[in-house]
């Protein structure tokens, strides 16, 4: 998509892991919570206030930004001390795009858990919870994002090194609604159309 291409240019991914982050960040939950812009700033060298060593360790590979469902589960378990069964219930709410009101019963447990473990202040716990609710609109799990990243990488490789074959295969096997767009792309690439 246009938004994925734009974000990839801003992030300049040089690994499948970073490309997976790009795929996961172009989701409504991440974008609505401002996580995408924050990720770009941090990837480009902006420093940030560290929340807690456990939290930062979980978010280390994503520059302190919560990107994946697995990170959400780890924070819920390791920062608030809630069991993985509870974290998994929250993950299911995230995965199924349920109404954020379904998060309400878990908010108090999370904040109390953070205070009891002395991992996050009440204010920080509430801020995290707000970010978590934004994730409820839709986010990927890491394996799903990685799968899309690998497919995207392969497609980009074939398009770059074998543009005729790429366009031809997509015209034959691709979506009917994309054919006009593919013909324009073929012209842009200087390919001869018969």
Task: Name each model feature, range by range.
Residues 2-194:
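Noncatalytic, beta-rich nucleic-acid-contacting surfaces in large DNA/RNA-processing enzymes
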């Amino acid at each position: 998509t246009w938004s994925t291409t734009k974000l990839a240019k801003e992030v300049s991914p040089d690994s499948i892991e970073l490309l997976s982050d790009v795929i996961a960040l172009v989701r409504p939950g991440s974008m609505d919570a401002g996580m995408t812009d924050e990720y770009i700033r941090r990837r480009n060298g902006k420093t940030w206030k560290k929340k807690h060593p456990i939290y930062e360790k979980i978010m280390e590979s994503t520059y302190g930004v919560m990107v994946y469902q697995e990170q959400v589960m780890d924070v819920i378990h390791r920062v608030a001390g809630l069991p993985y069964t509870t974290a998994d219930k929250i993950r299911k709410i995230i995965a199924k795009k349920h109404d954020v009101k379904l998060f309400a019963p878990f908010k108090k447990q999370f904040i109390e858990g953070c205070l009891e473990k002395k991992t996050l202040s009440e204010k920080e716990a509430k801020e995290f919870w707000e970010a978590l609710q934004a994730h409820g609109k839709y986010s990927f799990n890491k394996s799903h994002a990685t799968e899309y990243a690998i497919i995207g990488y392969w497609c980009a490789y074939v398009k770059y090194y074998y543009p005729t074959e790429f366009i031809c295969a997509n015209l034959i096997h691709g979506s009917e609604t994309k054919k006009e767009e593919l013909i324009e792309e073929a012209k842009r690439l200087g390919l001869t159309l018969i």
